[in-house]
Design a protein with these regions (language model features):
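Loop-to-helix entry region of an early transmembrane alpha helix in multi-pass inner-membrane enzymes
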Residues: 43-55, 59-79, 110-114, 255, ...
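Transmembrane-helix motifs of polytopic, lipid-linked glycan transferases
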Residues: 65-89, 121-122, 126, 274
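Specific aromatic-rich, kink-prone transmembrane helix
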Residues: 80-83, 99-103, 119-139, 143, ...
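Transmembrane alpha-helix segments characteristic
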Residues: 101, 164, 197, 279-302
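Short acidic/glycine- and proline-prone juxtamembrane loop motifs at membrane-interface regions
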Residues: 109-119, 209, 258, 311
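Membrane-lumen/periplasm interface segments of specific transmembrane helices
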Residues: 159, 187-272, 288, 292-299
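Membrane-interface helix-loop-helix junctions at transmembrane boundaries of multi-pass membrane enzymes
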Residues: 171-191, 271-290, 339-341
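Hydrophobic, aromatic-rich transmembrane alpha-helices
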Residues: 260-282, 289, 323-329, 334
C-alpha cells in the first residue's frame, strides 16, 4: 500500500482489533502528519467513510480484500465515465474514450491500490451524472457522501447543486399556473436540500465525536511533531500558499507528478474544449468545465500538491471529467471526416 492508504487501513485495524478509533497504537509514528488531535487522543486525520464501506472486504480477505475493493471501485468509476460521456455522444465514442482513460491515465496505476481518491471520485461522478439526468433526489446522496469521503469536494459539490437549483427553477416550459409551478419547484428544491443534509449527517456526527464540533475536520487538527517533540496542530486551510502561475506550471509539467506528462490524453481534452458549442447540452458541458477548473486551481495553490506516488491523485476528478472534452474532440473528428456519430436523445 502506498501513501495515505496505510492510514485508511489503520482505521479498520483499530476498529477490528481495538474496538476504537484511537490510532496512536496502530501506526509507527502518530506525529508525521497522518493523524489528527482529537478530544481523546490521536484520531483519523482522513475520512472514515471508505474504511467503513470496505470493512467487509477486510474481514473476509484482510489487506488483499482492500485491494479487491479498490479494483471494484475502479470498475465502477470506468462505468461512470462511460455513462457520463454517453449523455453527450454516441456509444462508440463514449466507449472509445472510456477505454483510453482506463488504460492511458493515472487510473491504471491507481487500480492496484486502496485509493481514497478513486472512492471519492466515484461518489462525485455518480452524483453529477444523476443531477445531469434530472434525478436530483438520488444525486444528492452521493454528492453529500462525496464531501464525507473528501472534504476538498465541497466547492465542486456546491457548484453542482447550484446548477441543479438553476435547472429546477428554470422550469419545463409548461403552462401550469404560477402558483402550482412555484409549489412544485420549491418542493423539489427543498427535498433535494433535505436529502443532501441527511447525507452529510454522518460526516458532521463523526466530526462532533472526534473534535467536539460538526464543523471541525481532521484536516484542521493535523498532528505533527514540534521542535520539542510534542504534538503541534496544523490547519490545512493554511496550506494553500503556492503562487498561482507557478502552481499551474508545476501541476502540469512536473516530471513525476505533472498531469500533462503522466496523462497525455489531456491534450485531446484541451482541443475538445474549443468545440463545446457543437454540443446541444452546452450548459452541462460548461458545468463540467467549471467544476474541473475549480479543482485544478485549488490543487495548483496547494502546498502539498506533489505528494502522490504517481501523477497527481488530487486531480483525479479533473482528469476523469476531462473525458467529455476528449469525446467532444473525437466527435468533431468524426463529423469532419463524415464518420457516423448520433447524439443521444436525452440531450436533444
Amino acid at each position: 500500500m502506498k501513501g495515505d492508504c496505510y492510514y485508511y487501513r489503520a482505521v479498520i485495524v483499530s476498529l477490528v482489533e481495538d474496538g476504537d478509533l484511537r490510532l496512536e497504537n496502530n501506526v509507527p509514528d502518530p506525529l508525521i502528519g497522518q493523524l489528527a488531535v482529537g478530544q481523546e487522543g490521536f484520531v483519523p486525520l482522513h475520512s472514515i467513510l471508505m474504511p467503513l464501506v470496505s470493512m467487509p472486504f477486510y474481514l473476509l480477505f484482510r489487506t488483499q480484500g482492500l485491494l479487491l475493493f479498490n479494483i471494484l471501485d475502479c470498475m465502477i468509476l470506468i462505468v461512470l465515465i462511460f455513462k457520463l460521456n454517453g449523455l453527450f455522444f454516441s456509444h462508440v465514442i463514449a466507449f472509445s474514450t472510456t477505454i483510453l482513460y482506463a488504460t492511458g491515465t493515472l487510473l491504471l496505476d491507481y487500480t492496484y491500490n486502496y485509493s481514497p481518491d478513486v472512492f471519492s471520485t466515484v461518489l462525485l461522478l455518480a452524483g453529477l451524472y444523476l443531477v445531469l439526468r434530472g434525478k436530483y433526489y438520488w444525486g444528492a446522496i452521493p454528492l453529500g457522501l462525496s464531501i464525507f469521503a473528501k472534504i476538498p469536494n465541497v466547492p465542486l459539490v456546491v457548484v453542482i447543486l447550484l446548477y441543479a437549483v438553476f435547472i429546477i427553477w428554470k422550469g419545463d416550459g409548461t403552462n401550469r399556473s404560477i402558483k402550482d409551478d412555484f409549489r412544485k419547484k420549491f418542493t423539489i428544491t427543498s427535498i433535494t436540500a433535505f436529502i443532501f443534509i441527511v447525507a452529510n449527517t454522518p460526516f458532521a456526527y463523526s466530526n462532533y465525536l472526534f473534535f467536539g464540533s460538526p464543523f471541525v475536520t481532521g484536516y484542521q487538527r493535523m498532528a505533527v511533531a514540534g521542535v520539542d517533540g510534542q504534538a503541534v496542530i496544523v490547519d490545512h486551510v493554511n496550506m494553500f500558499n503556492e503562487p498561482l502561475l507557478k502552481g499551474i506550471y508545476q501541476v502540469l509539467f512536473d516530471i513525476g507528478n505533472g498531469i500533462l506528462l503522466t496523462n497525455p490524453v489531456l491534450i485531446l481534452a484541451f482541443a475538445g474544449i474549443f468545440w463545446i458549442k457543437k454540443v446541444k447540452a452546452q450548459d452541462q458541458m460548461y458545468l463540467i468545465l467549471v467544476i474541473g477548473l475549480i479543482q485544478f486551481i485549488m490543487i495548483a495553490k496547494y502546498d502539498a500538491w506533489s505528494t502522490s506516488h504517481f501523477s497527481n491523485r488530487f486531480l483525479m476528478a479533473f482528469i476523469v471529467l476531462s473525458s467529455v472534452f476528449t469525446s467532444n474532440f473525437f466527435s468533431y473528428l468524426s463529423h469532419r471526416y463524415s464518420l457516423e456519430d448520433s447524439i443521444p436523445e436525452q440531450i436533444m
